[in-house]
A protein has these predicted regions:
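Compositionally biased terminal segments of proteins
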Residues: 1-186
Length: 186
């Protein structure tokens, strides 16, 4: 098995373990980020496991993971908490770009089977909005979100994503790129 495949297997194992812990603790969550996209057909991710939790549940979620022996951190950014299953990073995101995780985040999610585990998976529009609004002068890299757009284009409500990201010049530039490459049409 290739190193990349082993890394992905470790990521999935950490996701499955954390899912079980959070479900057992009764903490509502939604799988987000690259794994939410992979669950719908995007390429494998190698970065981390992203769980979206309501702000009022974030510390309880982190404590539940800590109680199983996972190392935890409270980064200074103030919009997420972290846990580590070995060296696999698990982000507990409660206030991403675009606004805090709320009831609407959960309402838009779908229950899917991911790696033999049933869980709520974030809507693609939510993942793309968060990724586009995170782009900045310090981090202007369109490559990962462009890859997602190519692989998931037929599944995304692009009008919704455009509307929710309209205030971002980076999102505007991204949509110009998508239009010029004929990945999506206005």
């Amino acid at each position: 098995m290739a190193v990349q495949d082993l890394e992905f297997e470790r990521l999935l194992a950490a996701m499955k373990k954390a899912t079980g812990v959070l479900q057992e603790a009764g903490v509502p969550f939604v799988l987000g980020g690259g794994l939410a996209c992979w669950a719908r057909g995007a390429p494998k991710t190698e970065h981390d496991v992203d769980f979206l939790v309501r702000p009022e549940d974030a510390e309880r979620a982190q404590q539940a993971l800590a109680d199983t022996g996972m190392r935890t951190e409270k980064p200074p950014e103030g919009w997420l908490l972290k846990a580590y299953d070995g060296d696999v990073l698990i982000d507990l995101i409660f206030d991403p770009q675009g606004g805090p995780v709320d009831d609407q985040t959960f309402a838009r999610a779908d229950e899917l089977e991911v790696y033999a585990t049933r869980l709520q998976v974030a809507a693609l529009e939510d993942v793309l909005v968060q990724k586009l609004l995170a782009l900045s002068e310090q981090q202007p890299d369109f490559s990962s979100v462009l890859e997602l757009a190519r692989s998931l284009r037929e599944q995304v409500d692009w009008d919704e994503v455009r509307e929710r990201t309209a205030a971002s010049p980076f999102a505007t530039a991204f949509f110009t790129l998508l239009d010029e490459l004929e990945i999506v049409q206005k």
